[in-house]
């Protein structure tokens, strides 16, 4: 009997994820016989689970908190995963388990869809210095952005991220945002500020250029106060749900051999599921 092709999400916890809904939508609409499951694996069991991933019946996996850094050490990472210091997508290349970080692709492709031509800019401002920030900074460097201001309330953390990259990444103190905003043609929030249950992100959108674009990685709520303020000014915006959908594309392609599309129907499906949140 032929085993159905399947992938999974490995996390701790992982039950809240919308990834199964996304991948099952693509499997159904593309007519592919396959599956996508959630595997709640504690940190102490992660190594053994990943090393025997195929034995568990999987041809690949997504990895979420708290396992992304550990996944890097247990696989053969590509340049993107190494640069970001974390892997979120695993797949088999023959007998070799490889890994990448699709947050970069998700961020870039979402911006391309929401603000075409955005990458013709010289300067960008990124808020936050966590793992998502590293993915965003790497993506901006890939697109040739000449100067990236990286702001964080703890300046040492911004400096640590800047030190990872041989590029013009400028650590910026939070209190100096007002001086940088007028030059930034792209503002990206990678912090949890503005997320449901978190304090609002207090940034004066009015200081941005009139042709700037604003991206927020938060997707609960879908329209954060930051994005609402940007839209009120007529700026191009990109929300966190778009990035979530676009980052899932590459994994599906690696596992099932077909590149899916992020459609309005898929977005509406996930939006409806997010609505109670």
Swiss-Prot record:
Active site: 68
Listed EC numbers: 1.1.1.25
Binding, shikimate: 17-19, 64, 88, 103, 219
Gene3D superfamilies associated with the record: Leucine Dehydrogenase, chain A, domain 1, NAD(P)-binding Rossmann-like Domain
Gene Ontology terms, MF aspect: NADP binding; shikimate 3-dehydrogenase (NADP+) activity
Any Pfam family: Shikimate_dh_N
Recorded family membership: Belongs to the shikimate dehydrogenase family.
Record-given protein name: Shikimate dehydrogenase (NADP(+))
Species annotation: Rhodopseudomonas palustris (strain BisB18)
Gene behind this protein: aroE
